From Swiss-Prot:
Primary role: Sigma factors are initiation factors that promote the attachment of RNA polymerase to specific initiation sites and are then released. This sigma factor recognizes a DNA element, designated as region A upstream of the pressure-regulated operon.
Record-level Gene Ontology MF annotations: DNA binding; DNA-binding transcription activator activity; nucleotidyltransferase activity; sigma factor activity
Database matches in InterPro entries: RNA_pol_sigma_54, RNA_pol_sigma_54_core-bd, RNA_pol_sigma_54_DNA-bd, RpoN_core-bd_sf
GO CC terms in record: DNA-directed RNA polymerase complex
Pfam families the UniProt entry points to: Sigma54_AID (PF00309), Sigma54_CBD (PF04963), Sigma54_DBD (PF04552)
GO terms (BP aspect): DNA-templated transcription initiation
Family: Belongs to the sigma-54 factor family.
Motif (RPON box): 470-478
Protein name, as recorded: RNA polymerase sigma-54 factor
Native source organism of the sequence: Shewanella violacea (strain JCM 10179 / CIP 106290 / LMG 19151 / DSS12)
DNA-binding segment(s): 382-401
Keyword list, A-Z: DNA-binding, DNA-directed RNA polymerase, Nucleotidyltransferase, Sigma factor, Transcription, Transcription regulation, Transferase
Region annotation Disordered: where it falls in the sequence: 54-92
NCBIfam families documented for this protein: PRK05932.1-2, PRK12469.1, rpoN_sigma
Length: 492
């Protein structure tokens, strides 16, 4: 056996640091992008703010894009001709110089899951409102008002909710609540029954009297076939203090569980929320800066990047010229290295703007009906539709439409809003799920409140318009819009 040298030729895909940077910038929101730019300005002396620059860096193109003739459908237009290219192509199209250098507690182990509560119904005629400011008390009151209670049970439910603290625990005993109500006709069993119903409110685990009850309520939502659920129940019911004290040896001795079984049961318990009330907290106001503006001028829809939202940076020519004049080799390498980083950063920004503009233009062209007539005219559209039209990969479309917002005459929308699934129609066409939601909202708004429409009736009405929708689909869309069922919408 001897050592030898061999020369081989082959092809290999490589994700360069420059391409990684371009992809990362593409998926940043406008606020995150501003922070990224500020960080680049702070760390790279070759970058500077160009206060005199008016247009965003889009390779010298006019930022305003005429959507041309929207009377034709997006399908018949074929791929859109645009000088913009994908991020990877933008990075490689210009040759660049070669000098670029290149002990845990319960609080620690518990990972909060996203709040399951849906947001308020959205009014598309209003600007983007961000998160709801609803607190725990308001959230429970809202659910109480949607629950069919008798007059006595409604009063009991109100008293129970008023006794729940911000963590979600009941701070008064059943006897204290009974005494505070002062109604001789109400019995302790009635309060217990109403409490059980409230404990099924969102968030699950609410109105528990202690930690053990809180966790058992949540565990009851799991299927009985869930692995290790029986062991988890035993641990919560009988040995919660030992879990808190992390006395695993004593736990294994008392429960006769092997180490692996005990670990699995504890991991299941750690998925539960010991303070469910904190999952519903008043949300802070969220402000959205639109990335794209859509306006109608002389009967034609115009798409433009938001000039106030686009970075205005350039290379500091004074420092760049010092790369040749300096006599120190170390200084020269420092300047040349930062110069290349600055050029790549600016090029990545240009590519981001080009891609965002190109995709936004295609969305507006595809969804012209929405801009003209509203949600009911929304066409079914998936990522692949736009990807084929602009000749980019679906992953690129996904990145450029996430956390990017479009300011339109109908409100501010995330670009992802314009994508929706489809439902077949009798004439062989398709209707988007967004349009179906709009139809449901319209039907509910116009219904006789003494005889509200059931899900089955709405399905029949949509079928009369040629839209085939199952009753279960109607119920799913209705619940997503926080519209109560027909029996709870009925009024005199």
């Amino acid at each position: 056996m001897k050592a030898s040298l061999q020369l081989k030729m082959g092809q290999q895909l490589t994700m360069t640091p420059q391409l990684q940077q371009a992809i990362r910038l593409l998926q940043l929101s406008s606020l995150e992008l501003q922070q990224e730019i500020q960080q680049a300005l702070d760390s790279n002396p070759l970058l500077e703010l160009d206060e005199e620059q008016v247009d965003p860096p889009v390779n010298g193109e006019d930022k305003t894009v005429d959507t041309e003739d929207f009377s034709a459908t997006a399908e018949s237009d074929g791929p859109i001709d645009n000088s913009a290219v994908e991020t990877s192509e933008a990075i490689t199209r210009d040759s660049m110089p070669e000098e670029l250098p290149m002990d845990t507690t319960w609080d620690e182990v518990y990972t909060a899951s996203p709040n399951s509560t849906s947001g308020a119904m959205r009014d598309d005629d209003m600007p983007f409102q961000g998160e709801t400011s609803e607190g725990l008390y308001e959230h429970l009151e809202w659910q109480k008002n949607l629950t069919p209670f008798s007059d006595n049970d409604l009063a009991i439910a109100t008293a129970i909710i008023e006794a729940i603290d911000e963590r979600g625990y009941l701070t008064q005993s059943i006897e204290d609540i009974l005494e505070a109500m002062g109604d001789p006709e109400i019995e302790q069993d009635e309060i217990e029954a109403v409490l059980k119903r409230i404990q099924h409110f969102d968030p699950i685990g609410i109105a528990a009297r202690d930690l053990s009850e809180c966790l058992l309520i949540q565990l009851a939502q799991y299927a009985d076939t869930t692995p290790h659920i029986d062991n988890a129940r035993i641990l919560i019911r009988d040995h919660l203090d030992l879990i808190a004290g992390r006395d695993f040896r004593l736990l294994m001795r008392k429960t006769k569980l092997k180490e692996d079984a005990l670990r699995d049961a504890i991991e299941l318990i750690q998925t539960l929320n010991p303070r469910p009330g904190l999952a519903v907290t008043p949300g802070k106001d969220e402000y959205v800066i639109p990335d794209v503006t859509v306006t109608k001028k002389k009967g034609r829809w115009m798409v433009e990047l938001n000039p106030d939202n686009m970075p205005k940076i350039s290379v500091n020519q004074h420092y760049a010229s010092m790369a040749k004049s300096t006599k120190s080799q170390a200084d020269s390498q420092f300047i040349r290295g930062h110069l290349q980083e600055a050029k790549w950063f600016i090029k990545s920004l240009e590519s981001r703007n080009e891609t965002l503009l190109k995709v936004s233009k295609c969305i507006v062209k595809f969804q012209q009906g929405f801009f003209e007539f509203g949600e009911e005219a929304m066409k079914p559209m998936v990522l692949n539709d736009i990807a084929e039209a602009v000749e980019m990969h679906e992953s690129t479309i996904s990145r450029v439409t996430t956390q990017k917002y479009m300011h339109t005459p109908r409100g501010i929308f995330e670009l992802k809003y314009f994508f929706s699934s489809h439902v077949a129609t009798d004439d062989g066409g398709e209707c988007s799920s967004t349009a179906i939601r709009a139809f449901i909202k319209k039907l509910v708004a116009a219904e006789n409140q003494q005889k509200p429409l059931s899900d089955s009736k709405m399905a029949l009405l949509l079928a009369d318009q040629g839209i085939k929708v199952a009753r279960r689909t109607i119920a799913k869309y209705r619940e997503a819009m926080l519209i109560p069922p027909s029996n709870q919408r009925k009024s005199l």
